[in-house]
């Protein structure tokens, strides 16, 4: 049995960590800092433009050495190298995993099954660049001869979460006068609200679906098509729709000129695809040069991950810290706390990246996993979160490791309330303060010295000892955003290697899709006919639904 498919919990490295946890579990972050005056300077990493402080973690230098030993026992370096070589490490689908090829420079070479994938990638990027230039310059015109003013991306999952997050993060780099919107949910209110104030004659849709058969995407695309053709006629489809897909036959049947179809490959998973043609809407907004900088940022961290020893390898160290808390301290969630409103959708993006990748209960060989996997990722931008859920982080009973993300230079800055100072300084002072309070808290003795009323000391005591990592960068640029995304991509991969998981499939998503397709006719028929194998709960809910839809009243019947 290969290392990545074996039971990591049976290794001596895992057992050493268990014993170490038992020996040191009472040790606090406050005590770790008191014992090591250089800790705050030395437990840091630099990867590209990212400065990463992980000193406020419940780990000693010996803990870190044991975690690196675990990574080597799991074969992290071997699996990493196999991925970069283009080996078929996605074994359940018999595919290579080559999102890293999307950001290789044009002069690089990577051959898979005798084929140069870098040349393929740059051919598509060049076509995207030509198209985005035509749109941005006004050369591309709609059916009435007017230039396009709004691009609407229709996709779901990785075809929405990635480009939507990136567009919001980099919207200050948008310089074409073209706004971008996103439709993903099959709830019709999403499409209706998005199109409410748009003009069909100046709107272009990007329909992103690899197979051009995704139910939610094609349902929304069909309604967008009706919206366009009812105003402009059938001939308008070719001027107001383009596709990100590999199914030329279905794209053509929809009415899209296949010259305006931009492909990507089976070796790119949806949640890793924002650097491919799936990012076309982003390129239209920020231009091909800024998009190239975005890809260069990914590549910077790809090289760091590929070339740096595990002891100083930022994605590997952060992944190992995640395993430490999930599997040795029982932490179930991870808070993502960007102190940047522009990164407002970054936690949701990471939810898919982490939870779809490692939310598995069997290893890549199909055998059951003997430990916890797949932490729940969640979060909100600071300082909003401080007035929502930080109370639980500071004084609750749950262990919640957190990642703070901040920038030295703001996209925009304004003076403080008194007309002086800097709003950005206020924002960042909150980041630094929150990470400090989470780590060190406030003791009863400190409160007593501050003359706190005795009956309030217990209420105001902050236990501290909540671990956090702080990731800082000079400024949120296209390159830095690419670096941040790649940092988390490779973290997720390393965690998956340690668990023996196949991190690049998502079979759990498929069954719900299949059953929805089977149930939809029962909802549409309205005649009370239900599949004979339905459970009583689902049958009762569908009957209630029929009653309300037909008569405006709820009628709950027995199956």
Swiss-Prot record:
- What GO cellular component is one of the record's annotations? cytosol
Q: Which GO terms describe its molecular function?
A: carbohydrate derivative binding; glucose-6-phosphate isomerase activity; monosaccharide binding
* Superkingdom of the organism of origin: Bacteria
Q: Where is the active site?
A: 356 (proton donor), 387, 513
A Pfam family recorded for this sequence: PGI
Instruction: Specify the species.
Output: Rhodococcus jostii (strain RHA1)
Q: Name one GO biological process term.
A: glycolytic process
Q: Where in the cell is it found?
A: Cytoplasm
Could you tell me what this protein does? Catalyzes the reversible isomerization of glucose-6-phosphate to fructose-6-phosphate.
E.C. no: 5.3.1.9
Keyword annotations: Cytoplasm, Gluconeogenesis, Glycolysis, Isomerase, Plasmid
Q: Which CDD domains match?
A: SIS_PGI_1, SIS_PGI_2
Q: What is this protein called?
A: Glucose-6-phosphate isomerase 4
Establish whether keyword Iron-sulfur is in the entry. Answer: no
| Reaction it catalyzes | alpha-D-glucose 6-phosphate = beta-D-fructose 6-phosphate
PANTHER family per UniProt: GLUCOSE-6-PHOSPHATE ISOMERASE
Pathway assignment reads: Carbohydrate biosynthesis; gluconeogenesis; Carbohydrate degradation; glycolysis; D-glyceraldehyde 3-phosphate and glycerone phosphate from D-glucose: step 2/4
Protein family membership: Belongs to the GPI family.
């Amino acid at each position: 049995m290969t290392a990545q498919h074996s039971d990591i919990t049976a290794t001596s490295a895992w057992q050493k960590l268990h014993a170490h946890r038992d020996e040191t579990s009472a040790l606090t972050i406050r005590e770790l800092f008191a014992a090591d005056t250089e800790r705050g300077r030395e437990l840091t990493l630099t990867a590209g433009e990212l400065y990463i402080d992980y000193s406020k973690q419940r780990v000693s230098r010996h803990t870190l050495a044991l975690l690196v030993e675990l990574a080597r026992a799991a074969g992290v370096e071997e699996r990493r190298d196999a991925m970069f070589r283009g080996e078929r490490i996605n074994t359940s689908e018999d595919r290579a995993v080559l999102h890293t090829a999307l950001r290789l420079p044009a002069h690089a070479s990577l051959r898979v099954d005798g084929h140069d994938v870098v040349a393929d990638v740059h051919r598509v990027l060049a076509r995207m660049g030509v198209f985005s230039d035509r749109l941005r310059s006004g050369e591309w015109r709609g059916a009435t001869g007017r230039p396009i003013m709004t691009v609407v991306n229709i996709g779901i999952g990785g075809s929405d979460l990635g480009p939507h997050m990136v567009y919001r993060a980099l919207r200050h780099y948008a310089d074409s006068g073209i706004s971008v919107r996103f439709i993903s949910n099959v709830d019709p209110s999403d499409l209706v609200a998005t199109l409410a104030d748009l003009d069909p004659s100046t709107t272009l849709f990007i329909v992103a679906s690899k197979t051009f058969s995704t139910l939610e995407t094609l349902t929304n695309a069909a309604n967008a098509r009706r919206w366009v053709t009812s105003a402009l006629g059938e001939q308008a489809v070719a001027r107001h729709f383009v596709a990100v897909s590999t199914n030329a036959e279905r794209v053509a049947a929809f009415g899209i000129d296949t010259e305006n179809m931009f492909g990507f490959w089976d070796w790119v998973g949806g949640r890793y695809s924002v650097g491919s043609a799936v990012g076309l809407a982003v390129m239209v907004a920020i231009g091909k040069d800024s998009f190239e900088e975005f890809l260069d940022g990914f590549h910077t961290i790809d090289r760091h991950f590929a070339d740096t020893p595990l002891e100083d390898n930022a994605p590997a160290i952060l992944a190992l810290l995640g395993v430490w808390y999930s599997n040795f301290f029982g932490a179930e969630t991870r808070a993502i706390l960007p102190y940047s409103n522009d990164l407002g959708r970054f936690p949701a993006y990471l939810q898919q990246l982490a939870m779809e990748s490692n939310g598995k209960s069997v290893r890549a060989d199909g055998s059951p996993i003997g430990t916890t996997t797949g932490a729940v990722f969640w979060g909100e931008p600071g300082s909003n979160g401080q007035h929502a859920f930080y109370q639980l982080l500071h004084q609750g009973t749950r262990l919640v490791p957190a990642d703070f993300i901040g920038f030295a230079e703001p996209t925009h800055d304004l003076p403080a309330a008194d007309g002086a100072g800097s709003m950005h300084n206020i924002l960042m002072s909150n980041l630094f303060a929150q990470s400090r309070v989470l780590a060190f808290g406030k003791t009863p003795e400190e409160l007593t010295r501050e003359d706190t009323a005795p009956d309030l000391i217990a209420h105001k005591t902050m236990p501290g000892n909540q671990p956090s990592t702080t990731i800082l960068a000079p400024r949120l640029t296209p390159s830095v955003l690419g670096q941040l995304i790649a940092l988390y991509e490779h973290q997720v991969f390393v965690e998956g290697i340690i668990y023996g998981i196949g991190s690049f499939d998502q079979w759990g998503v498929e069954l719900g899709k299949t059953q929805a397709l089977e149930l939809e006719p029962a909802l549409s028929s309205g005649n009370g006919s239900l599949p004979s194998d339905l459970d009583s709960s689902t049958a009762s809910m569908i009957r209630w639904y029929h009653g309300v839809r037909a008569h405006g009243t709820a009628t709950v019947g027995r199956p």
